[in-house]
Amino acid sequence: MMKKITRRSFLSICGAAAAAAALTACGGAASSTAASSAAASSTAASASSTAALSGNVATGGSTSMKNVIAALTEGFAEIEPDVTISYDPTGSGAGITSAADKTLDIGLSSRALKADETGVTGTIVALDGIAIIVNKDSKVEDLTVDQLKQMFTGEITNWSEVGGDDGEIVLVGREAGSGTRDGFESIVDVKDSCKYAQELTATGAVISAVEANPLAIGYASLSAIGDTVKAVTVGGVECSEETVKDGSYEVQRPFVFVTNDSVTLSAQAQAFFDFAASTDAADLIRTAGAVPVNE
């Protein structure tokens, strides 16, 4: 099951406590022993409800979500400094499986859940454009989805066929099980039919391989792209926050928090989940290079 949070107020408990304190103050005119006892109880309850959280929140999965998780972790630490967020970059498939088998509090996936991935719920916290990257010296500036399909399946093998210099196209992709690979292949309709020259285990490795080879083409998360490679337009549309959010850029996918349907999250895990899915996290997500869904 997939869902998209529109807004959560993870500090609602604090608001409730403040309201309770205000009501207690209004009733302070009655100075009986019973009133004093009630006020003391209210104060204790308020202190308990706003007590700082502690403990660990175990997350893991998508390697493409590394920058987003790092930013969210840093922002959350300003609110709950005694909570530790761990992150194990094992790939989207492993993240979903680990949420299902209760190994992780929150699994991370850079693709939507599949029909057979049951017992868990996916919550979209951000969107990510999958940038099509070429070497900075390449003359190619734009490719269509159909051209990408033909290139990655081996129907088009020379750069001259798509406006580049003469030279055999070198296809660089991610390893099987990668959420980025799954997203790219699903969107471009090349599932399990790509003729990769290299299958690499991390987004950074793909970027480095394309940077080093003037004949290479690959794909990588928008949030990870720097100035060492060139992102081509797809169908004339640049891969950017605006085009991902408005849907005009075709090669995009969600960043998903995956939780187990049969487990109640710990207080600290729920607080981190709510923070990540709230408007308070929008600037952090944007700083990490992804597109926030809640603003």
Residue ranges, per PLM feature:
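N-terminal export leaders
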Residues: R7-L11
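Exported/periplasmic ABC-transporter solute-binding proteins
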Residues: K3-I5, G27-T103, G107-E295
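Hydrophobic helical h-region of N-terminal Sec-dependent signal peptides
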Residues: G15-A19
